[in-house]
Amino acid sequence: MSNTTSALPSSVPAVSLDPNATLCQDWEQSHHLLFHLANLSLGLGFLIPTTLALHMIFLRLLLMTGCSLFIAWATLYRCTLDVMVWNVVFLLVNFMHFFFLLYKRRPIKIDRELKSVYKRMFEPLHVREALFQRLTGQFCTIQTLKKGQVYAAEDKTSVDERLSILLKGKMKVSYRGHFLHNIYTNAFIDSPEFRSTQMNRGERFQVTIAAEENCKLLCWSRERLTYFLESESFLNEVFRYLIGKDITNKLYSLNDPTLSDKAVKKMDRQPSLCSQLSMMQMRNSMASTSDTDDVLNQILRGGSTGSSLQKNPLTKTSTTMKPIEEGLEDDVFESESPTTSQNVSKTTKKDI
């Protein structure tokens, strides 16, 4: 029986394994240490958090390290040309990107005369050095004025030409020979006029601006600066904020011309009573008119706000906003009448 069963052909064919087949029979030994170090550097590069400031630079460094180790492993221990060529290509690409990142982070050297303006006005608003250099390097000039020279003449100089910041010195603003306020270092010279030209073109200065000391100015071409700010939305918002703040400082110094340089820089003082009254008149005038830009122009031109608005027939009173009552402040300057003095004496007698 056993002989017959052994003579029968087997129904299951024998499996013949080709040594070139994909199924692994004998695993090769582990590769050299360089191979593992190369993969480790690639893995560390991909694990760097993106919140890190130098994330891209560290990533490129680790990728270049991994490619270099792969090149050494393929050349010295495996002798595989294709692996070596591909990693050389990857190494060159990463090196070019790494060099570009270093070039972008190079220190920008700002001119010594402009450094104080950048530190005081633009750096607190997160304007980078490269953007500030573009702003000051293309279409602006540094001009000098000697003591007594006029920057703008009343009713003569056009306001459409330039926008300037005072870098050094001190300037005086006057209207028809009457002193209005001073302009100190790191402040716009003609910010109110720049604001007014955005609404009305072809106007002239309504004040005279002259140098009280030897001055240095940073001047932009008005037209070219406007085109540049249209393409840089962030910088446009920065300029709007700086000019608005400068106009506010000029309003305070206009109401209190005795402000010193330190007081203008700090602007944390409480206005005096006279300053509060004049500011109250300005706010009443702006609250009782519908066109606040016209009121602002009239204020900055040096005229009396209340009288100019009363004489102007074009101003319309607002139905939604009422002027602020000034009765309490006006009582401070009123002299005592006989009736009030008698009432006061009666109350004192009763108290006694």
From Swiss-Prot:
Disruption phenotype: Morpholino knockdown of the protein causes cardiac edema in 70% of the injected morphants. They show malformed myotendinous junction and, in 80% of the morphants, skeletal muscle is characterized by myofibrillar misalignment and fiber detachment.
Pfam families the record matches: POPDC1-3
Mode of membrane association: Multi-pass membrane protein
Subcellular location: Lateral cell membrane; Cell junction, Tight junction; Membrane; Cell membrane, Sarcolemma
GO-annotated cellular components: bicellular tight junction; caveola; lateral plasma membrane; membrane; plasma membrane; sarcolemma
Entry comment describing in which tissues the protein is expressed: Expressed in skeletal muscle (at protein level).
UniProt name for this protein: Popeye domain-containing protein 1
